[in-house]
Amino acid sequence: MDISKIMEIIVKLFGSKKSEVKSNDKPPKKAQDIAKKFEKTTGKATKIWKVGDKLSPHFSYDEMTRSQTAERNSIDNTPKIENVENLIALCENVLEPVRVHFKKPATVTSGFRCIELNRKIGSTDRSQHTKGEAADFVINGSPTVTDVWKWIIDSDLDFDQVIQEFGRWIHVSYKRSGVNRHKCSIAKKVDGKTRYFHYTEEQIEKGEYEL
């Protein structure tokens, strides 16, 4: 489909060629409605969000969706509207409170991953990254990865899963629907293989875990 046809569809749907999304703002509900209409008409993931648009005060659409692997392999990692809504919920309910508490930038190393990208890096189709429900991140310097992991668990935050991975980064997830499990784990390499050790919140509170 050439660009003129695409513009005709957009004008018919929205009545204007101007974007409803303001840079640095959380996409308004009208923009989300527009995105849903665009998806329904074209069958493609929406591109209504752009670089610089905020999903929460300290986290942007760009950093939650970008991937060097996707860029190197020409993979379109554009999320669908429900994936973006999941990312917003993840930012608002977990990542933003972590950023505010530690008062240091949190670097997202992996956020949303489409199925093609997820398979490219060797992950399973069941990964919550493919739904926009999960992110891997680090806070540089102090506190340690374990400090952040433990704070999330000890806090009143609602989360589905939090994993301290190899002492290098945190994997955290949040579900908008259903019950968040509060699953707490540590990932380690044992005899060259990745193993996950699971703990209850009570065990972690008592210090009954091994790094």
Each language-model region and where it sits:
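Extracytoplasmic cell-surface/polysaccharide-interacting catalytic and binding patches
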Residues: 3-101, 188-211
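Extended, low-complexity, intrinsically disordered C-terminal regulatory tails
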Residues: 95-121
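Acidic, His- and aromatic-enriched active-site or binding-groove loops in soluble protein domains
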Residues: 125-146
